């Protein structure tokens, strides 16, 4: 950020190398007085320019230019209207305090407004099972009565095994006419499966 100042437009600018005078004027912030040593200079713009140009930019500080301080810059502008060029303009405020209600004094009041925004978000997840009791019991019964088929063995396809009464379900399907066809089909499927396994 760059700040350019036209010193010729100011009635007078204070510096520590010029004449010192005292004043009781202060600038207040929120009703509090700021006390610093008051400094004045004569309205000789050429002398001030010469002094400022003789210093390197690194050595120039707030004591060399009143405009570097925002509070003092405001004080210069307000006092320049109320005083003439011969009286000088205050660079810094004095150690004395003054009532903020006096007419004719400059006063700056700063108010800080804080905006607080609260954004509260609550996320909830509820899982509800809508399975009816009837469907649940049906599924349990299905799993309960799931038939476990016996392991297929090589000798299970023999004629003796097919005609054996142990394969019948309580005599309901004893030596059924479809039993031989079933075991023949099962033997063929087993051979195909074994051939696929060999090919892999």
UniProtKB/Swiss-Prot annotation:
Presence of the UniProt keyword Amino-acid biosynthesis in the record: no
Q: Which cofactors are reported in the record for this sequence?
A: Mg(2+)
Post-translational modification remark: O-glycosylated. Hyperphosphorylated on serine residues, when in dimeric form. Phosphorylation by host CK1 is required for the hyperphosphorylation of NSP5 dimer.
Biological process GO annotation list?
A: viral genome replication
- Residues reported to bind Mg(2+): 92
Bias (Polar residues): 91-100
Per the UniProt record, one Pfam family is: Rota_NS26
Q: What is its main location?
A: host cell
The UniProt entry's sequence similarity note says: Belongs to the rotavirus NSP5 family.
Function, as annotated, reads: Plays an essential role in the viral genome replication. Participates, together with NSP2, in the formation of viral factories (viroplasms), which are large inclusions in the host cytoplasm where replication intermediates are assembled and viral RNA replication takes place. Orchestrates the recruitment of viroplasmic proteins such as capsid proteins to these factories. Participates in the selective exclusion of host proteins from stress granules (SG) and P bodies (PB). Also participates in the sequestration of these remodeled organelles in viral factories.
Name of the protein in question: Non-structural protein 5
């Amino acid at each position: 950020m760059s700040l350019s100042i036209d010193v010729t437009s100011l009635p007078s600018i204070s510096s520590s190398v010029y004449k010192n005078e005292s004043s009781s004027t202060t600038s207040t912030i929120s009703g509090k007085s700021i006390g610093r040593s008051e400094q004045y200079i004569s309205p000789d713009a050429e002398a001030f320019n010469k002094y400022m140009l003789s210093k390197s930019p690194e050595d120039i500080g707030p004591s060399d230019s009143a405009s570097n301080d925002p509070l003092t810059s405001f004080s210069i502008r307000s006092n320049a209207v109320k005083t003439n060029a011969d009286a000088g303009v205050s660079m810094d405020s004095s150690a004395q305090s003054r009532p903020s209600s006096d007419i004719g004094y400059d006063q700056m009041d700063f108010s800080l407004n804080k905006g607080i925004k609260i954004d509260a978000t609550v996320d909830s997840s509820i899982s509800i099972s809508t399975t009816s009791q009837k469907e649940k019991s049906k599924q349990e019964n299905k799993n309960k009565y799931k038939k476990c088929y016996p392991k297929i063995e090589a000798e299970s396809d023999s004629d003796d095994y097919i005609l054996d009464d142990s394969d019948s379900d309580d005599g309901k399907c004893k030596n059924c006419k479809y039993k031989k066809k079933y075991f023949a089909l099962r033997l063929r499927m087993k051979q195909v499966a074994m051939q696929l396994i060999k090919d892999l």
